[in-house]
Amino acid sequence: MSNSRQHQGHFARKRFGQNFLVDHGVIDSIVATIGPARGQRMVEIGPGLGALTEPLIERLATPESPLHAVELDRDLIGRLQQRFGALLELHAGDALAFDFRSLAAPGDKPSLRIVGNLPYNISSPLLFHLMTFADAVVDQHFMLQNEVVERMVAEPGTKAFSRLSVMLQYRYVMEKMLDVPPESFQPPPKVDSAIVRMIPYEPHELPDVDPVLLGEIVSAAFSQRRKMLRNTLGDYRETIDFDALGFDLARRAEDVSVAEYVGVAQALAAVRKAG
């Protein structure tokens, strides 16, 4: 596979994190994993040159119910509009600022299926942005750097377990689906990639916790991940009775389960509400 940054007459732009998927066998496997069907409300983030867009449109789109796509590169937007016409509704802009809820069906029932080969340089902030729309989402399938996927699905007690692990596992059931080698792209990235499936928990399955407070606790815990929690969470020892929670501070951040972090955030919420 050539290392050229040019593909189909378009130069991949580093500032957009562009690496275009070109392996048709991998594309077929990804589409089979997603399982698109007519009438589904699907959004593709960063369609690029349309490698996934075309088979998705073939399986689900009609002029009355098109595939939606969010794309920042205006050169690509023109090409995609010309190629797919009314079967693709393009939304020009940055996915990090896009209101995905605006594409959801009316009512409270989740309706969006979101897919994409996400730009690796913004993957974590984009995942956190998407989490704010999780109640409107049926599922998400993303191509990401393999290291990021491993962190997303990591178990407590492992080196890969991180702030990203806790915050996403609190909100989603996640599964690594496929490995994708660098040679599947043009130009090939310098890292391995993987497909992850993310299914939001339903409202009745979610713990009753303020995600902002959970994020506050988790960020503090992982701020110096080689230090013990008695140091990183030291500022909270006067407000939270860790002994009453059965929470051992003589551990590192990666040794604590999602449920335990939720318990600490709930305790913090109770103290602040009482105060």
Swiss-Prot record:
PROSITE patterns: SAM_RNA_A_N6_MT (PS51689). GO terms for molecular function: 16S rRNA (adenine(1518)-N(6)/adenine(1519)-N(6))-dimethyltransferase activity; RNA binding. It catalyses: adenosine(1518)/adenosine(1519) in 16S rRNA + 4 S-adenosyl-L-methionine = N(6)-dimethyladenosine(1518)/N(6)-dimethyladenosine(1519) in 16S rRNA + 4 S-adenosyl-L-homocysteine + 4 H(+). SUPFAM superfamilies: S-adenosyl-L-methionine-dependent methyltransferases. InterPro entries: KsgA/Erm, rRNA_Ade_diMease-like_C, rRNA_Ade_methylase_Trfase_N, rRNA_adenine_dimethylase, SAM-dependent_MTases_sf. It is found in: Cytoplasm. Its EC number is 2.1.1.182. Belongs to the class I-like SAM-binding methyltransferase superfamily. rRNA adenine N(6)-methyltransferase family. RsmA subfamily. HAMAP family: 16SrRNA_methyltr_A. This is Ribosomal RNA small subunit methyltransferase A. It comes from Burkholderia cenocepacia (strain ATCC BAA-245 / DSM 16553 / LMG 16656 / NCTC 13227 / J2315 / CF5610). The lineage of its organism: Bacteria, Pseudomonadati, Pseudomonadota, Betaproteobacteria, Burkholderiales.
